[in-house]
C-alpha cells in the first residue's frame, strides 16, 4: 500500500538489512531517520559492532541515526521469559518485536515523525505477519502511520550489496 511521503522513522535491526528498505523508501520520497533500538542483541560487543557499521553507513549517506537505550534486561523481562524452547519461539519473537517497535514509536511520536517502518521483514527467518501486527499495534496509539512492507524478496539483493560493500554480516539475529 502506497502512502504519501512522510517524515519516517525507520527501525533498523542491522545495516545489511537496512540497505534495500532504505533505498525503496527513499525512492517513495520519504524523509527518513534511522532508529537503532535493539536491546535484543547479545552480547554487548555484538550490539556495538552492528551499531558501528550502521553509524558509518548512515554518516556516508548523510542520514541521522537515533539510538535507543541498550537495555538487555528489558529484553529479558519482555521476551526472555519464553526461554529457548522452539515451541515458544513465535511468542518470544512477538515480545521482542513489540519491545523494539514500541520504543521506536514512542520516540517517533515525541519527535514529530509521521510514521514508522522497520527493516525486520528483510530476513526470511522472521515472522513477517507478526511484525506487521506489532508495527500496527505500536503505531496506533500514537497516531502514526505504520509503513509496513514485506521485504523478503529484497533479501538476496541486500545480501549481494552488503557483501560487495565489505559490510559486516552477522550470522544470527542477535537474541540469546
Q: Which residues does each predicted region cover?
A:
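Nucleotide-activated chemistry modules centered on ATP-dependent adenylation/adenylyltransferase
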Residues: 2-176
Amino acid at each position: 500500500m502506497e502512502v504519501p511521503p512522510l517524515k519516517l522513522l525507520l527501525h533498523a535491526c542491522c545495516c545489511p538489512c537496512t540497505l534495500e528498505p532504505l533505498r525503496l523508501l527513499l525512492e517513495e520520497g520519504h524523509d527518513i531517520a534511522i532508529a537503532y533500538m535493539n536491546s535484543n542483541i547479545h552480547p554487548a560487543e555484538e550490539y556495538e559492532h552492528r551499531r558501528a557499521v550502521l553509524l558509518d553507513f548512515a554518516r556516508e549517506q548523510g542520514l541521522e541515526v537515533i539510538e535507543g537505550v541498550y537495555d538487555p534486561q528489558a529484553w529479558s523481562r519482555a521476551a526472555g521469559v519464553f526461554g529457548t524452547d522452539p515451541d515458544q519461539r513465535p511468542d518470544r519473537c512477538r515480545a521482542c518485536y513489540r519491545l523494539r517497535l514500541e520504543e521506536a514509536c514512542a520516540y517517533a511520536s515525541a519527535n514529530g515523525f509521521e510514521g514508522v517502518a522497520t527493516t525486520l521483514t528483510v530476513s526470511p527467518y522472521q515472522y513477517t505477519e507478526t511484525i506487521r501486527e506489532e508495527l500496527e499495534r505500536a503505531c496506533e496509539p500514537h497516531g502514526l502511520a505504520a509503513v509496513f512492507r514485506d521485504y523478503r524478496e529484497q533479501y538476496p539483493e541486500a545480501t549481494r550489496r552488503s557483501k560487495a560493500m565489505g559490510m559486516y554480516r552477522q550470522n544470527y539475529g542477535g537474541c540469546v
